[in-house]
């Protein structure tokens, strides 16, 4: 697969649409110009389920891949290689690239090259006040006066050419913010279960969950706790459901929460969120919040787009 992608139009994917992301071996070699965002790409790929290694000498790539794939069973690997690798390794990239494809298959190995326009790179280095790798003479950080920044950027293009010419995908980050970069990478590599909705019932008397994205207080609803025959039951029991059936406000509140979540949860997906936690709280976390959490799970699972997972947990279950 050879796709050079510098525009926003086409969006090549590294996986077959009919194949599960987790079932396919995906070895992604990520290289590119200093300041173009290669490290950000590796961090995003790690968030997307890749085992990421940055600044790996090219000569060690075959050994690292073999250990990760054969010894650890890891199937999604992103290896960052850049100008800091020994120069002899760069000239030997073709042989390393071919050996990986022979060992793991043509479709398993992809080279991604990250770049940016020269004026963008200069602006980024000036903004961060970092020194270009080719302007550093030794490990003490002494600046190499043989290169100014534009010259170092131009020289790096020449040195990385052995990798660049094998690029299956090129990403120009000049006009991309971090959110757009995330979206682009998600399109390239594919993501199983792109977002998980975690519904959590809890009791306010034991404290509010600190990791919730949304918290709904349902203590205004009728409380089965005050019915002696229902005190030992929970919101998962049929008799509690029958109790709530006599109160239309319970159905109305459940519907209102579902409407709100159906409206806004898809936006979290487009904002590159992987999980969203929705907490439903009553006094003790046994009746009202449990009942609504269970019914919300059923409602959302049927109404949200396919591929989203809705889970339900009850924080106070050990207290029942």
UniProtKB/Swiss-Prot annotation:
Belongs to the RapZ-like family. It comes from Psychrobacter arcticus (strain DSM 17307 / VKM B-2377 / 273-4). ATP binds at residues 32-39. This is Nucleotide-binding protein Psyc_0118. It holds the Pfam family PapZ_C. Keywords: ATP-binding, GTP-binding, Nucleotide-binding. GO terms for molecular function: ATP binding; GTP binding. GTP binds at residues 82-85. It comes from the Bacteria. Displays ATPase and GTPase activities.
């Amino acid at each position: 697969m050879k796709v050079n992608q510098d525009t926003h139009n086409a969006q090549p994917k590294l996986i077959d649409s009919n194949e599960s992301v987790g079932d396919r071996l995906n070895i992604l070699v990520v290289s590119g110009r200093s300041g173009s965002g290669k490290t950000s790409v590796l961090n995003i790929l790690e968030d997307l389920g890749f085992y990421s290694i940055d600044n790996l000498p090219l000569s060690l790539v075959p050994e690292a891949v073999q250990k990760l794939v054969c010894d650890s069973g890891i199937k999604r690997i992103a290896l960052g290689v850049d100008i800091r690798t020994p120069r002899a390794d760069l000239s030997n990239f073709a042989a390393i690239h071919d050996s990986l494809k022979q060992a793991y298959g043509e479709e398993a190995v992809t080279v991604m090259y990250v770049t940016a326009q020269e004026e963008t790179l200069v602006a980024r280095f000036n903004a961060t006040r970092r020194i270009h790798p080719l302007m550093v003479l030794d490990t003490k950080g002494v600046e190499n006066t043989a290169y100014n920044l534009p010259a170092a950027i131009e020289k790096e293009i020449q040195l990385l050419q052995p990798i660049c010419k094998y690029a299956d995908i090129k990403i120009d980050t000049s006009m991309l913010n971090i959110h757009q970069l995330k979206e682009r990478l998600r399109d390239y590599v594919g993501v199983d279960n792109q977002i998980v909705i975690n519904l959590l019932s809890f009791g306010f008397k034991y404290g509010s969950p600190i990791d919730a994205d949304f918290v709904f207080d349902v203590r205004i609803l009728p409380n089965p706790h005050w019915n002696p025959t229902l005190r030992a039951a929970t919101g998962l029991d049929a008799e509690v459901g029958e109790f709530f059936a006599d109160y239309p406000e319970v159905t109305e509140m459940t519907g209102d929460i579902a409407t709100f979540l159906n409206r806004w949860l898809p936006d979290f997906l487009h904002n590159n969120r992987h999980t969203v936690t929705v907490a439903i709280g009553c006094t003790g976390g046994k009746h009202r919040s449990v009942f609504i959490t269970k019914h919300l799970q059923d409602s959302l699972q049927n109404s949200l787009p396919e591929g989203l997972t809705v889970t339900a947990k009850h924080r106070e279950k050990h207290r029942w």
